[in-house]
């Protein structure tokens, strides 16, 4: 017993320590496909069991009706000037049920699926970030979701109908000056007391900031730490922990109403404070029984919320950017040709289209998991980080291609609000730096690993003998599986994954990708196992965690892209998009794994690189064998060994996945610089106005006409080259001459003239008159002295 107790104690020291709040976070959510990727032997049936569900007729009608109407009403430039949505927009949001998208119908909500919820946010975000955030927040982590999941029946009956119809405007107060990314350390306190009337309640003090909808909220969902020094709740615990309660705005002691200006986007966001605020004990969401259970509630809800809101907003930005930039690059001319023909434009166009496909595929797949009842904590973190980073990349590419058109603010600029929204998306719901460095692999290595959590649970048994027996059993399975994955990683690394398995029934042209994912999954599991000896230091070695998280994330993104391609019918015309998306993700995963092992703080783990990337190991072993054979006078063996050594050096490739090449880039860029079904599908779900008064409507008209006019322009150009007509004349005269000389018809000339008009309208930017200063305020210029004449 003494020896076993000592062993258990020693092993515990090596395992990563987990705080109470971390345990609650790890216990929240579910493990699904993320666990398969961590296992080293992913069962693809567990991914393909999710169908790509379509919206119901009611959900589609809501998108085509109220959402379309709201998009037409909101105008970013007017919103910027008035610092708010127009009254008509607020009226629609409340009356049409935008604030209760997933609240059940029996409580007055829409009862929509998560897929529909995401579709609503995505379409709104493509039109107005302010409108999208205004709708997003009441439907995400906050009072409605928490009451629906954990509230008492009385809370549901009273609040959910009022939240659904907009009678109550909610906000959720978690972040404060001293608790940002480390939200679990919130200093805000509530004490269980009895007031002067003898009523049991909580006296609260808090200081919060960055609270969206806070300035106009009527109901605050408040996160705080609850204390019960007099044991009035009878739980026998003084520090109960993080709790969530409902605080009406008009409660005495609440200070609320001031606004922040997040990147000057005018959605309502601001600070609030509470000084000796008293609320009844029944204000706790879920009642007194849920006192101290707030962190688990928040983590459970966040596992779903992070799958919906920001991924939808980010994908909207990606789709809109691809839609508008592909067409603008075709319409805009420089150096006598469409700028879409330049390779310098082609490269970012391909990146935009490929990343848009990758992002939307991950969004769609994860939504199916949520609608199937899962709470995908790790996938939601992956989406939060990688889709907002994808938004950053794509919008920046769009800005580069649009140039001054995107820089000059005004009613004609469709990108300025998207660009301003990037740092907000990057920062909220878990800052991206923290998400990448701490959460994706930091939590995934424990909760999604097939054995780590079981080993920790075994060690927690208070009986050392039982703890030892449980741990030994799990460890044996862990080591056995780890050994199998090590062999698989080595064999697949040496053979180019030729003998790796691919699921049956998938497009044959994509089977190589499944094999690579299987190989990298085994290698990832091996590297994860080899990182566990870091124990508690794993949290401090953030660069290890970040790189391993990149491997994990890109395997998830690649696999969901393949899922989306198959569920979308494996259409031949979309093959270039899935090729680009998967090649991009696998190359990043492989590079991240190489970097993680190359820079690993443990020497033994660095040696794992020679198993995962075995070229040096195998060529070295063959060379040694050849030398030994030569030494013992076995010339035939020596010759064969030499041939094998050279062959291994030539044919074994450590990095089996390359980034998309120029040819594929060209094909992918074509998907958005040419009209057609692929472009329509890729950008489906965003607001696409058809009115010429709208910048996007005008651009789309010009884009489609440009396809008709380009052959006519070529005829005119060739006529000038052949001397049929002179190009040294005004544009109008040139077109007249082309008609007169039968180069083009009069009807065709009318199209060319219309194209010139539309192109001019598209490339124009806004300009504003400068207000004339009062006479006494006019600057006084001092004329420069004339130069002296020698």
Model-derived features: where do they sit?
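A glycine-rich, basic-preceded beta-loop-alpha segment at the flavin cofactor/substrate interface
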Residues: 273-306, 323-340, 487-509, 520-539
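A short core secondary-structure module
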Residues: 199-255
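Charged, glycine-rich active-site and insertion segments that engage polyanionic ligands
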Residues: 374-406, 576-589
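A glycine-biased, small/acidic residue-tolerant capping/turn segment at secondary-structure junctions
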Residues: 392-419, 596-609
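Amphipathic, small/basic residue-rich leader segments at the start of a protein or domain
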Residues: 1-138, 145, 149-169, 181, ...
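C-terminal amphipathic alpha-helical interaction region
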Residues: 477-790
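Flexible, small-/acidic-enriched active-site or ligand-binding loops
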Residues: 252-278
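Loop-to-helix element that buttresses phosphate recognition and phosphoryl-transfer chemistry
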Residues: 344-371, 396-399, 555-564
């Amino acid at each position: 017993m003494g020896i076993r107790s000592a062993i258990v104690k020693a092993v515990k020291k090596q395992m990563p320590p987990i705080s109470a709040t971390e345990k609650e976070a790890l216990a929240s959510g579910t493990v699904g496909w993320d666990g398969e990727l961590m296992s080293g032997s992913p069962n693809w049936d567990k991914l393909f069991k999710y169908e790509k569900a379509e919206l119901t007729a009611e959900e589609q009608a809501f998108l085509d009706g109220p959402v379309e109407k709201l998009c037409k009403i909101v105008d970013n430039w007017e919103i910027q000037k008035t610092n708010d949505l127009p009254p008509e927009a607020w009226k629609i949001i409340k009356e049409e049920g935008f604030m209760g998208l997933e609240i059940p119908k029996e409580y007055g909500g829409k009862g929509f699926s998560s897929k529909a919820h995401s579709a609503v946010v995505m379409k709104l975000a493509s039109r107005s970030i302010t409108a999208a955030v205004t709708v997003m927040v009441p439907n995400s982590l906050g009072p409605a979701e928490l009451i629906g999941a954990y509230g008492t029946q009385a809370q549901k009956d009273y609040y959910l109908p009022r939240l659904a119809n907009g009678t109550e405007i909610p906000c959720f107060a978690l972040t404060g000056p001293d608790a940002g990314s480390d939200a679990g350390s919130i200093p805000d306190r509530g004490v269980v007391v009895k007031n002067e009337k003898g009523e049991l309640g909580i006296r609260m003090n808090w200081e919060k900031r960055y609270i969206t909808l806070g300035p106009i909220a009527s109901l605050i969902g408040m996160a705080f730490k609850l204390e019960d020094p007099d044991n009035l709740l009878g739980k026998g615990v003084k520090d109960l922990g993080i709790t969530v309660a409902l605080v009406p705005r008009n409660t005495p002691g609440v200070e609320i109403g001031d606004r922040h200006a997040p990147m000057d986007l005018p959605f309502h966001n601001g600070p609030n404070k509470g000084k000796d605020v008293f609320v009844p004990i029944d204000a706790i969401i879920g009642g007194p029984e849920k006192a101290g259970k707030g962190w688990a509630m928040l983590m459970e809800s966040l596992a779903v919320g992070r799958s919906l809101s920001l991924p939808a907003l980010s994908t909207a930005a990606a789709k809109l950017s691809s839609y508008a930039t592909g067409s603008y690059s075709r319409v805009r001319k420089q150096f006598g040709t469409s700028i879409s023909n330049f390779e310098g434009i082609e490269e970012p166009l391909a990146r935009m289209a490929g990343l848009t496909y990758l992002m939307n595929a991950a969004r769609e797949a994860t939504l199916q998991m949520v609608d199937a009842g899962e709470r995908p904590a790790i996938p939601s973190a992956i989406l939060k980080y990688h889709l907002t980073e994808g938004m950053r990349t794509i919008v920046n590419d769009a800005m580069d291609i649009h140039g001054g058109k995107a820089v000059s603010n005004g009613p004609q600029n469709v990108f300025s609000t998207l660009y301003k929204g990037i740092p907000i998306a990057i920062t909220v719901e878990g800052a991206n730096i923290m998400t990448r460095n701490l959460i994706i692999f930091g939590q995934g290595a424990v909760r999604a690993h097939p054995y780590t959590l079981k080993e920790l649970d075994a060690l927690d048994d208070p009986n050392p003998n039982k703890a030892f027996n449980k741990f030994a059993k799990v460890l044996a399975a862990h080591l056995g599986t780890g050994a199998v994955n090590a062999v698989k990683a080595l064999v697949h690394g040496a053979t180019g994954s030729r003998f790796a398995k691919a699921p049956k029934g998938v497009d044959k042209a994509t089977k190589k990708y499944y094999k690579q994912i299987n190989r990298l999954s085994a290698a990832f599991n091996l590297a994860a196992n080899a990182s566990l000896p870091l124990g508690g230091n794993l949290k401090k070695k953030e660069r290890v965690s970040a790189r391993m998280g990149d491997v994990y994330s890109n395997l998830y993104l690649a696999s969901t892209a393949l899922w989306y391609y198959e569920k979308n019918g494996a259409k031949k015309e979309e093959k270039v998009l899935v090729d680009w998306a998967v090649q991009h993700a696998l190359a990043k995963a492989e590079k991240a794994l190489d970097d993680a092992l190359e820079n690993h703080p443990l020497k033994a783990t660095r040696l794992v690189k020679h198993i995962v990337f075995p070229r040096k190991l195998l060529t070295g072993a063959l060379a040694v064998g050849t030398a030994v054979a030569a030494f013992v006078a076995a010339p035939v063996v020596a010759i064969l060994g030499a041939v094998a050594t050279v062959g291994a050096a030539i044919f074994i490739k450590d990095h089996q996945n390359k980034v998309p090449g120029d040819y594929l880039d060209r094909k992918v860029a074509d998907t958005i610089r040419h009209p057609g079904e692929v472009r329509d599908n890729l950008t489906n779900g965003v607001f696409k106005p058809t009115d010429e008064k709208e910048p996007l409507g005008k651009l789309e008209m010009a884009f489609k006409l440009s396809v008709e006019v380009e052959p006519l322009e070529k005829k005119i150009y060739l006529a000038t080259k052949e001397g049929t007509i002179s190009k040294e004349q005004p544009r109008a005269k040139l077109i007249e001459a082309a008609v007169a000389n039968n180069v083009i018809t009069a009807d065709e000339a009318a199209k060319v003239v219309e194209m010139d008009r539309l192109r001019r309208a598209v490339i124009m930017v806004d300009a504003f008159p400068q207000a004339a200063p009062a006479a006494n305020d006019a600057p006084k210029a001092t004329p420069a002295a004339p130069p002296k004449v020698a």
